[in-house]
Design a protein with these regions (language model features):
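A beta-strand edge to alpha-helix "cap/lid" segment located at domain peripheries
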Residues: 2-27, 37-138
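Helix-to-beta-strand junctions that scaffold the AdoMet/dcAdoMet cofactor pocket
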Residues: 33
Length: 138
């Protein structure tokens, strides 16, 4: 089961990258639970798949328009066979718009964040129950 689950989770991560790179908010939210929780890099919290998708429409048409996304899985921990924590480092590349001052990122440099995904397996599918993202300053 673990090897299968590892591959399925890696596939979910690959799907997130591909959806970001296409600026496809619907696909980016596809495996986000209907009642999932999203905390963005500003510390704002939102509930539900529809809101997660709506927020990413803003992301893909705003300051991160045209960017590319890299995700590096640092650690995958199974809390139970059907619950996993995925600790990732993200990099947003190709930023061409000035970021708010809260980000200490020179124009053109990648934005780095730490992302914790809480994943729940239901009906043979891994779902994102929690998406908690924090800005890395260095």
């Amino acid at each position: 089961m673990a090897a299968t689950s590892n591959q399925e989770i890696n596939d979910l991560i690959s799907d997130l990258i591909a959806a970001w790179d296409r600026a496809d908010a619907k696909a980016f939210a596809r495996q986000f639970q209907k009642d999932g929780t999203f905390t963005n890099i500003f510390g704002q919290t939102f509930e539900g798949q529809e809101e997660f998708e709506r927020r990413h429409v803003d992301v893909f048409t705003g300051i991160f328009k045209g960017t590319k996304f890299e995700l590096e899985l640092l650690k995958l921990k199974y809390v139970r066979p059907d619950v996993a924590l995925a600790d990732l480092e993200t990099r947003v590349l190709g930023i061409t718009k000035k970021l708010p001052p809260v980000f200490q990122v020179p124009l053109g440099a990648p934005l780095r964040t730490r992302l914790l995904l809480v994943l729940v397996r239901e009906s043979d599918t891994w779902w994102i129950a929690g998406y908690h993202n924090v800005d890395l300053k260095s």
